[in-house]
Structures are given as structure tokens and as C-alpha cells.
């Protein structure tokens, strides 16, 4: 209110009486004296604040209790919040589950577990890593509501998350998904890597967590400063701030942000959201959180709108948390931040029901029947159909008990449900799930009109289905600055399936985008291009200010000889490559990161090291098929074709939908001379991927070598039907006809081709030869 006080000071005195000259001179003298007396203090104040700031010592963590000594209201709000109760030592005060010798039979695998006490200890008898019933001590609780999970110590410094949890809403034991665990060797079994607390959960449930995974010994020495999510998990280490705050106000030197590492005041919405994003997102971490990131991609790389994680229109499907969905929302683009709805300390909503939304949206326009068309009372009972969140934030249930609203905050689109088989809030359980989709659409169109805006979901769905017509739309969407960044990056990523000059140009343009996620995705799209393209366009990104972009550039340039790099670029490349390797080693308790290290070794020509990394990835997760496919390719390259074929057969047996693996095995068997099986597999691959013509062409070649000429002819015709301009396919079929003197068929081939591709050089040449009654020798 300083401005208001200043304005009041300029108002006339009461009664409007003017002051005498003597009074004015007396006032002036007093002011002058005050200035003289204050000058030394002003100088000292100025000096301490701006000329010679005191050196700042290394920041250390001090704990939430220390913060609460000064910030009592915030501390009180934080206590008993989900952050405060994120993890704890198992005790009478913290354990919610019933351990009074309670038996629970898992309906999915018929294993009966028993929960009981052994003195002060909390025990469970359940299926162990070898499939037999074993007894384990529970040492830690994990979470509190709507479920509480339990952690069990295992060798190698591991804590394993039991797959049976306590439903604290319904007060019962229940099995936590996933349910399709294929035995005790499955990575998803509760005793294996998919349920290891150290790598899967720990970083977001404790403060100053250091994972400390040693990939050489496959062990952890995980530590934390505070077991739960305390003040410093968001604000960063607080020792410098505490020292600063202890001093009298006049003695406090000017240090940035009062000594706090993370600035949470007077920052942009995107910067604010980036504080929450590292935990509230589907992503992979680049290292322990040191609270010094300027950009989200300095600490993690968020998942895009990938198939299996999101529906094609961007609605949540798998457990993706909040960031990826919220980043699509209009709220995100209009600078609405998490704290506008959630209290940052208690995590509770500021208001209940529609009042939360009416903080910004006009009640007269939105909180009325003419907008939502739902009554507050229906058939004599309260109805929640009028609530904003029921339509705009439909929830999905995760972990078998946790109902999480979709934070993309979207307008319902039942029309997309018809075309894309995506969910819509009208048809969800508890609303109109019993009604036909046509009934929902009819009502929606009657209320809001049938005219619909174009939606990126149509394009993403088409690209996922490898629609050849999707490429142009993807390029447009990737370059559309008005679309959400995560949507643009997804379009750019999907463009990798449409190689060609136009796609390359789009990727190169995206390298200069302001957003790091776009730049990161563009590098991935260029990493398999020729040496000169990568040197020209990717090498400058070795200097990018964002870590996630730099290390992706280093990985993309790994196969480039250092002699091809400029002298200055060699040092930048080596520095970024070290960052990349450190990030992969940090996450090497997961198969994908060992796989990435294998790819790096292979790119650098170290086949033995690459084979070792691929085998380690497979040992971690036997169902991680990319490592098996790449290992098979490496075996093939080093002459071990039998081992390569066996690996690919293993992949296909467990993943029959992996048509690329079927194609690879077909090619390998053709190379090995096993043409009958090769032709069958190549045909399967071609049938499964009709948009890709190469499998069909290779099937044709195998059939021709087997002297199954008519089948080979049909395969070539199918390939040309999809890609009529392909000269290689045309020439192979033309030579087949000419070798058997099938001139009429050759003439028909020429005519059909020229109808579709009038300037087809080979077809024009063959037409002239046929007209002259000549054929090539």
C-alpha cells in the first residue's frame, strides 16, 4: 500500500489552511538536518546492498522444522498434507493397514498373503522372488490416501514396493495393478525392477534424495535428507536463507532471493510450473534434482503424447500424472499456474465445486443451466452433472483406487469418440455410460451445434496408423506456434516415420525453436541422416543452454569421426557426451538406458561393449524387445546369424504385433538362404504394414529366387499400387515380363504407370522400346 500512502501525503491539510512562510522554513531546516544525519546510514545501506555483497556460503539442507520456526502458518498447512505423509517409517502412528493376522487372496494369481505383527514389527507372508511363500518385514509406509503402500528391504540396498496395498478410502487390502505379470521373472513382479522404490518412486517422495545407483555392481546406496516431501523439496536447501534471516533487517546483505536456491516469487507461470513438473509428470530424470535448473529439460525429459500413454486426442490413458495433460490446456497457455487452484502447502483446492473455477470464469455465463444443461437435482436426488470438472476434467482410476482428473481441461468432444474411439466425459461411468454414443452426440449437437473445430487428435491418430497423407499436416502442426508445445513436439516426433526432404526441412527449422522440447525432438528426428547434415545442423546444439538438448546432440553425433568436427566443437562434443553418459548411467537401473549406452557404443564402433550393454538391458527386463532387436542386428553384423535369428524369433513369439521384427527376421533368413521361411515372414510383414512397400518388394525378390514367378509378380504389383513412382519396383517387374517375353503385360505395366506418373523415366523408355518392337538385351 506504499503508493496509497504516498498519494495521501500529497493531500491538502485539514480545512485547507495554508502554512506560513516561517513554518515552511522550519520544515525545510528539519528536512535538511534529517538528510545530513541520515546520509552515512544511507551510504552504508547502499554499500551493503549493492556494491560489495557478502560472499554466499554453500547451501545446505536444514529440514522443515527449521523452516517452520519462522514460517509457522505455511508449516502448519504443510503438516499432514500428502507431501508431509509421502513416506515414513512404519510404526503404530503411520501404518494404516490391518495387520491383525489378516489373510488376503489375490484374485489375479490366487496367492494368499497374510498380514501380521511380530512384536513392534509389521510383517507379511507372501510370494517371494522364487515363487514360494516367504515372510518379510515392512519397514516403511508409502503414501497415505486413497491408498497406502508398503516397502520391504531387499539385497543390494533395494526397497521393494509390495503389490498389495491398503485402500484407505474403503479400509481393505487389495491388489495394485498391473495384473498381467508373467511370473516372478517378470520385470513388473513386485520383487523386480519395475517395483524397486529406489528407481521408480523415491525421487518424488523424499527431500534431497540421492539415488546412488552403481551400475557395475547393480546396487544402491540411496540417501535422503528428509524422508518426506518437505519445504526444501520445492524451495531448495535453506541454510543460506536461515543465516540471512537471523540477522537484523538492517544488517541483511543483498543476496539473490534471500539466499534461497529456488525463486518462487514474481516468476512466470511456466517457471512456476517447472518447479512442480519434475515430479508431477511422466518423464525420465537426467540426474538427482539439484534445484538449479532454468529449464524443465535441464533435469528431465517429459514423455510426449505417445501411443499407449495418451489417447490420440491427448486425453490421459496410462499413468502420466499431470504435466503432459496440463501442458495441452488453454489454461497453461494463458498463464494459469498450479497455485491458482491448489494451495502450495496444504495442496488442497482453494475452493470447492464450481466456486474454484468461478475465481476466473463468470458465473452468469458458465454456472447456469443454459451452459451445462444439467440440473442440480435429478429425480429427487442431488446431481453433480452441473459441476465444471465433470465435463471438463473427467477422471481415470490409477493404481486401482486413485481417481485422477485429466488436467488438459478440455471441451467434451463426443464426435471424436465416434471417429477416434476416444473417451468423452458424457459417456463416463457415473454419467451416461449406459447410453449409446449416438444418443450422447445427438444431445450434444442439439445443445452446442454440430460444427466442430479441427482437432490435432485426428492428425495424431492418422499418423499413428501410418497414413501417408498425414505428413503435410504433421509438418504444419509442428510449426504452428499457436498450438501447445507438447502437441507440436509430438507431431515432430511422428514425422520421423515420414522421411524425405520436406521432413528434414521441418526438423532443421525446429532446431531454432524457442522451446527446448521442440529442439530436443528435432535432434532425434535428424540423428540418422547423413554425416554432413548432422555436422551442419546438430553440431551447433552442442552449445545449447539446456542440458537435455546438448546431450541429445552429443548422442546424435556419436558416430561422427572427431576429425570431421571443428576444433572448438570437439571440446563441446566431449563435454556434452560426458553429460549424456552420466545421465544414462544415472538411470542404468532401467533397461532403456543400458540400451542407449549400447547404441552409443555401437555408434562408436565398439561392438563388444555394445553387445554387453544390450545383454545387460535384457537381463534387467527380458521383455524389453528393442535391446533384443538391436542385439540381433549386431550379431548379424558380426557374423553370428543363428544367434540373431534366435533372438528375433524370441521377440516375435512374445510380441507378435512387432511387425518390424517380423520384417527383420525375414530379411535375415533371406540372407541366410532360408528363402521359404523368409518369403512367408516377409509376406506377413507386408500384410501387417501395407503402407510400407519395402517388405512387399523383398517378399517378391524371395519368391522370384524360389522361382514362384506368379506370386512374385503379384507382390510387385501390390508394391507398385502403393508406390507407383518407385523405379526399382518398376524395373524389377518389367525385367520379369521381358525375360519371359510377356510383352502385353509389359505394355499394360507401362500404360498403368504413366497414367499415375506421366514423367516416369523408365516407363517412358520401355514404352519407346516396345513401340519400336525392341526390348532390352
Cite the ranges covered by each PLM segment.
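Amphipathic alpha-helical scaffolding segments comprising HEAT/armadillo-like alpha-solenoid repeats
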Residues: 468-478, 500-512, 530-542, 564-581
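Structural marker of alpha-solenoid helical repeat scaffolds
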Residues: 498, 513, 529, 544-545, ...
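Structural signature of tandem alpha-helical TPR/SEL1-like repeats
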Residues: 501-502, 533-535, 569-581, 604-616, ...
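Helix-start (N-cap) detector for alpha-helical repeat units in TPR-like alpha-solenoids
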Residues: 485, 516-519, 547, 591-592, ...
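Primarily the internal scaffold of c-type cytochrome electron-transfer domains
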Residues: 65, 73-143, 149-155, 161-163, ...
Amino acid at each position: 500500500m506504499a503508493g496509497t500512502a504516498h498519494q495521501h501525503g500529497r493531500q491538502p491539510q485539514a480545512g485547507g489552511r495554508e502554512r506560513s512562510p516561517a513554518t515552511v522554513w522550519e520544515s525545510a531546516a528539519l528536512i535538511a538536518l534529517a538528510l545530513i544525519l541520515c546520509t552515512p546510514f544511507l551510504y552504508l545501506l547502499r554499500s551493503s546492498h549493492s556494491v560489495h555483497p557478502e560472499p554466499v556460503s554453500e547451501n545446505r539442507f536444514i529440514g522443515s522444522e527449521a523452516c517452520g520456526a519462522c514460517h509457522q502458518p505455511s508449516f502448519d498447512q504443510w503438516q499432514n498434507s500428502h507431501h508431509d505423509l509421502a513416506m515414513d517409517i512404519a510404526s503404530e502412528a503411520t501404518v494404516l493397514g490391518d495387520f491383525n493376522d489378516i489373510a488376503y487372496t489375490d484374485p489375479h494369481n490366487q496367492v494368499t498373503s497374510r498380514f501380521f505383527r511380530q512384536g513392534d514389527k509389521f510383517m507379511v507372508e507372501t510370494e517371494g522372488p522364487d515363487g514360494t511363500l516367504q515372510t518379510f518385514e515392512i519397514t516403511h509406509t508409502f503414501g497415505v490416501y486413497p491408498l497406502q503402500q508398503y516397502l520391504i528391504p531387499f539385497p543390494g540396498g533395494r526397497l521393494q514396493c509390495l503389490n498389495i496395498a491398503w485402500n484407505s478410502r474403503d479400509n481393505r487390502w487389495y491388489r495394485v495393478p498391473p495384473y498381467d505379470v508373467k511370473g516372478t521373472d517378470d520385470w513388473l513382479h513386485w520383487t523386480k525392477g519395475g517395483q524397486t522404490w529406489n528407481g521408480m518412486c523415491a525421487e518424488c517422495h523424499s527431500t534431497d534424495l540421492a539415488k546412488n545407483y552403481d551400475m557395475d555392481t547393480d546396487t544402491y546406496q540411496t540417501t535422503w535428507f528428509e524422508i518426506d516431501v518437505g519445504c526444501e523439496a520445492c524451495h531448495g536447501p535453506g541454510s543460506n536463507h536461515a543465516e540471512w534471516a537471523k540477522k537484523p533487517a538492517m544488517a541483511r546483505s543483498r543476496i539473490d532471493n534471500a539466499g534461497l536456491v529456488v525463486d518462487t516469487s514474481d516468476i512466470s507461470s511456466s517457471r512456476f510450473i517447472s518447479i512442480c513438473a519434475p515430479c508431477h509428470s511422466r518423464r525420465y530424470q537426467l540426474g538427482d534434482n539439484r534445484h538449479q535448473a532454468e529449464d524443465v529439460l535441464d533435469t528431465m525429459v517429459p514423455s510426449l503424447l505417445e501411443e499407449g500413454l495418451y489417447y490420440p486426442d491427448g486425453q490421459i490413458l496410462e499413468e502420466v500424472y499431470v504435466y503432459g495433460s496440463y501442458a495441452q490446456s488453454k489454461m497453461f497457455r494463458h498463464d494459469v499456474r498450479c497455485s491458482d487452484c491448489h494451495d502450495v502447502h496444504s495442496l488442497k483446492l482453494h475452493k470447492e465445486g464450481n466456486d474454484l473455477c468461478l475465481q476466473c470464469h463468470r458465473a452468469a455465463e458458465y454456472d447456469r443451466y443454459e451452459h451445462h444443461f444439467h440440473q442440480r437435482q435429478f429425480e429427487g436426488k442431488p446431481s453433480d452433472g452441473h459441476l465444471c470438472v465433470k465435463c471438463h476434467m473427467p477422471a481415470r482410476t490409477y493404481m486401482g483406487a486413485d481417481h485422477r482428473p485429466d488436467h488438459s481441461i478440455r471441451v467434451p468432444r463426443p464426435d471424436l469418440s465416434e471417429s477416434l474411439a476416444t473417451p468423452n466425459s458424457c459417456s463416463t461411468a457415473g454419467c451416461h455410460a449406459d447410453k449409446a454414443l449416438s444418443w450422447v452426440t445427438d444431445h450434444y449437437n442439439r445443445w452446442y451445434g454440430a460444427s466442430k473445430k479441427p482437432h490435432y487428435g485426428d492428425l495424431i491418430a492418422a499418423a499413428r496408423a501410418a497414413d501417408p497423407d498425414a505428413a503435410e499436416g504433421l509438418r504444419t502442426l509442428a510449426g504452428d506456434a499457436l498450438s501447445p508445445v507438447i502437441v507440436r513436439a509430438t507431431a515432430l516426433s511422428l514425422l520421423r516415420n515420414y522421411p524425405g526432404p520436406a521432413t528434414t526441412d521441418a526438423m532443421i527449422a525446429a532446431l531454432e525453436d524457442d522451446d527446448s522440447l521442440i529442439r530436443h525432438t528435432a535432434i532425434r528426428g535428424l540423428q540418422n541422416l547423413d554425416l554432413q547434415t548432422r555436422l551442419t545442423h546438430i553440431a551447433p546444439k552442442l552449445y545449447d543452454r539446456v542440458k537435455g538438448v546438448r546431450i541429445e546432440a552429443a548422442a546424435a553425433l556419436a558416430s561422427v569421426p572427431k576429425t570431421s568436427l571443428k576444433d572448438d566443437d570437439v571440446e563441446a562434443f566431449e563435454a556434452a557426451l560426458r553429460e549424456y553418459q552420466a545421465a544414462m548411467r544415472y538411470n542404468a537401473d532401467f533397461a532403456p538406458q543400458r540400451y542407449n549406452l549400447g547404441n552409443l557404443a555401437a555408434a562408436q564402433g565398439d561392438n563388444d561393449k555394445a553387445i554387453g550393454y544390450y545383454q545387460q538391458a535384457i537381463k534387467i527386463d527380458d521383455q524389453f524387445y528393442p535391446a533384443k532387436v538391436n542385439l540381433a542386428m549386431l550379431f548379424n553384423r558380426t557374423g553370428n546369424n543363428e544367434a540373431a535369428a534366435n533372438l528375433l524369433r524370441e521377440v516375435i513369439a512374445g510380441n507378435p504385433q512387432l511387425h518390424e521384427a517380423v520384417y527383420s527376421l525375414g530379411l535375415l533368413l533371406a540372407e541366410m538362404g532360408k528363402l521359404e521361411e523368409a518369403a512367408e515372414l516377409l509376406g506377413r510383414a507386408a500384410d501387417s504394414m501395407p503402407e510400407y512397400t519395402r517388405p512387399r518388394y523383398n517378399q517378391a525378390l524371395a519368391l522370384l529366387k524360389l522361382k514362384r514367378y506368379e506370386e512374385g509378380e503379384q507382390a510387385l504389383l501390390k508394391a507398385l499400387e502403393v508406390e507407383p513412382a518407385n523405379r526399382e519396383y518398376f524395373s524389377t517387374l518389367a525385367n520379369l515380363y521381358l525375360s519371359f517375353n510377356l510383352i502385353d503385360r509389359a505394355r499394360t505395366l507401362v500404360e498403368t504407370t504413366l497414367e499415375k506418373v506421366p514423367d516416369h523415366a523408365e516407363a517412358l523408355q520401355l514404352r519407346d522400346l516396345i513401340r519400336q518392337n525392341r526390348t532390352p538385351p
